[in-house]
Amino acid sequence: MTIGTTDIFLLVIIVSTLIVGFFWGAARSVLLLAAWVLAFLAGAHLKTDLGSYLAREWGQFSVAYNDMAAFGVIYVGLLLAAPVIIFIGTRGNQRISKYQVLDDLVAAVFAVFVAVIGIGGVIIVLATFYETGPGALDTGGGPQWTATLYADLVSSTIGGGINEHILPIIGWVLGPLLPSDVREVFA
């Protein structure tokens, strides 16, 4: 097992969410999980609409790439906006039990879980273009940096583990709610 630059970056994300979740509160962390589901499903279902707009604006990229980019923009945009909206929308004590340490631990675990499935979501978004069809990782339809990001994520130790173990669970849980082209990633 080797730890590369991508693994260090993913580890920093996961540990950062552990710390933030510990101080943020259990109720907010549970809301963040719901926001992840909403962001992922919204991105999966709205990607074609935004993708057709991007295809008109970015004629140099393929339609499949524009759909993937639209999925990513919606997913990442909502996922980044969610903590701000949750923080502004919640007031007062965020405890769910009478034991502060239990609340802090539950919040940290939920935050780490959201970070892991958030990384998994990015892998799924990229896989909708790079993992399907012939010429996987062929950058003819998109810029090189997205292909490199996908290759680095799935070949890293942490990203590969998420890809192998977490993504099938996401596919099993959310599969019936996803469009068929996104479900193909889990096949």
Language model region names:
Residues M1-A187:
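Alpha-helical transmembrane segments and their juxtamembrane interface "caps"
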